[in-house]
Curated annotation (Swiss-Prot):
Compartments (UniProt record): Cellular thylakoid membrane
Keyword Acetylation belongs to the record: no
Record protein name field: ATP synthase subunit b
GO cellular component, one term: plasma membrane-derived thylakoid membrane
Record field: transmembrane: 26-46
Length: 179
């Protein structure tokens, strides 16, 4: 680059300019400046652009590789989760089936227990009925006995006068004393 600058400066000097000065022709000065800029760009641009593009290419390659790695991990995790989901569904189906079986067993046990309870209640009712009948019969016997005693007492009062009662008492005392 410096070589190019020296060459351009030498050519300007040989052209009679006598050195570096102010060139009032802006078009010519701009072309000269543009030529210098293009020279610098052509000399340094391939290295700098190559490095920038290489860095950019590497970043893109790294990003692609990272994305592919994440995609593989995601696919692996998805497969594992789908497997877990299938296992969970199978477990849920098994639990539902067991619950159905348990419900059926419980239903049968409840039906059996209900039948046994019903039989016990019927037997208890029959026993209660028998006990009630016995109680009623005993009550009737007691009432009949009371009525019979009352009737006998009434008959004795009517038949026994005071003399007869005295004789009966004396005879009873004599029987007790004569023993």
């Amino acid at each position: 680059m410096l070589n190019t600058l020296f060459i351009l400066a030498a050519e300007a000097h040989e052209a009679g300019e006598g050195g570096f000065g102010i060139n009032l022709d802006f078009l010519e000065a701009n072309l000269f400046n543009l030529a210098i800029l293009l020279g610098i760009i052509i000399y340094y641009a391939p290295k700098t652009l190559g490095k920038i593009l290489g860095d950019r290419r590497q970043k893109i390659a790294d990003a692609i590789e990272e994305a592919e790695t994440r995609q593989r991990k995601s696919a692996q995790i998805l497969a594992e989760e789908e497997k877990k989901l299938a296992q969970a569904k199978a477990e849920a189906a098994r639990i539902v089936q067991e619950a159905g079986q348990r419900a059926e067993v419980a239903k049968q046990e409840i039906a059996t227990q209900t039948e046994a309870d019903l039989r016990r209640m019927q037997e208890a009712a029959a026993q209660d009925l028998g006990a009630e009948q016995e109680r009623v019969i005993a009550e009737l016997k007691r009432r009949i006995a009371e009525q019979a005693v009352a009737k006998a007492e009434a008959d004795l009062r009517d038949r026994l006068n005071e003399d007869t009662q005295d004789r009966l008492i004396e005879r009873s005392i004599a029987q007790l004393g004569g023993r």
